Amino acid sequence: MTENKTVLYSYWRSSCSWRVRVALAYKKIKYEYKAIHLLKDGGQQKSDEYSKLNPMKAIPTLEIDGHIIGQSLAILEYLEETHPENPLMPKGSYERAIARQMMQIIGSDIQPLQNLKVLGLIAQYSGDDSKKSEWARTVITNGFNGLEKLLEKHSGKFCVGDSVSFADLCLPAQVYNANRFNVDMTPYPNITRVNQHLLTIPEFIEALPQNQPDAEPQC
């Protein structure tokens, strides 16, 4: 670990890394990008060297302020607490709770159930590679059904009112995944509307997969 140097271990298409990239952009924190390819060499996150940084062998990992932090949602909380400038949460306690509720729907109920590791297990135990997309669509649809209702009640320009929150940092990557797995977005007008707004904001554009140094041509 390099003292006083911020380093993000990331993969261009990783949903969890994407959230952190947006946060770092909003907080105006300069960092070094170190690519960890999730497929090459059997998964570079499984290497002995990287495992010393992150015992879960997952990304992202952030080196910052002399510390090493894994898990994207924990990283977001740390950045908000230690770098209060350009806040990423609403002021009101209730609004903050709703933002965290939305964040957890994506970060706990949807994305982990359709990530690369889980889809690999689906194919392995079913013996049918085509089941991966079917499973992902089911998981995303179930989660979006609940998220859409919350956005109908609480959203403005952003997921919660008219200011950015952790929920917004999680949304674009999940919509990206929904599109990858051909989820019908017609039933989700509020998710679509908020996501379209987010993708006009410079910090969100900077964090897009295709704008990362390790982006691959098929993006």
UniProtKB/Swiss-Prot annotation:
It catalyses: 4-maleylacetoacetate = 4-fumarylacetoacetate. Pathway: Amino-acid degradation; L-phenylalanine degradation; acetoacetate and fumarate from L-phenylalanine: step 5/6. Its cofactor is glutathione. One of its GO terms (molecular function) is maleylacetoacetate isomerase activity. One of its GO terms (cellular component) is mitochondrion. Glutathione binds at S14, S15, C16, S17, W18, R19, Q45, Q71, S72, Q111, N115, L116, K117. Keywords: Isomerase, Phenylalanine catabolism, Transferase, Tyrosine catabolism. It comes from the Eukaryota. CDD domains: GST_C_Zeta, GST_N_Zeta. Its EC number is 5.2.1.2. NCBIfam families: maiA. This is Maleylacetoacetate isomerase. It comes from Dictyostelium discoideum (Social amoeba). The lineage of its organism: Eukaryota, Amoebozoa, Evosea, Eumycetozoa, Dictyostelia.
